Amino acid sequence: LWAEALGIDPDNLIAGDSSSLNIMFDLISWSYIWGNNDSPRPWKDEETVKWICPVPGYDRHFSITEHFGFEMVQVPMTPTGPDMDAVEELVKDPQVKGMWTVPVFGNPTGVTFAPEVVEKLAAMETAAEDFRIVWDNAYAIHTLTGALPDNPDVIALAEKHGNLNRFWYM
């Protein structure tokens, strides 16, 4: 049911018993302490960890990266999603380890990412091999009309571009 609503392969879906914010905190905490499956070392051993924060954005996201002492780098939101010229420039820096996103009805602006923005996020080259995008799709099925928004399969898109581990999808 959820795989169909989210437009993803059911094999890529795990039903959890925790809030998505707790899961996000745990994933970042794990990467901070031990690294993730693409990390050359734990993030705590990095001189600096930077995180892309589209603004305006969700304050609870920002509190997680603030908790770990990450340098939060602001990127403006546009009517189609984050400013991709800015994002693509920032990810050339190996200290940039991740990015927050709310791709559908983003909090607080209500912006839904355009297909070309989603494609760029899945395909872009990053200097950090362990770069992650938190894909917080909390509002994927929240609509005021009978029509659900498009929910692109970012996992399949990332795999198509050789970036299978790019997204932490919530």
Show the residue positions of the predicted features.
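Donor nucleotide-activated moiety binding/catalytic core segment of transferases
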Residues: 166-169
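Residue-level marker for buried hydrophobic side chains located in beta-strands
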Residues: 133-134
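Walker B catalytic acidic pair
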Residues: 137
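Conserved core of the PLP fold type I
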Residues: 1-129, 141-162
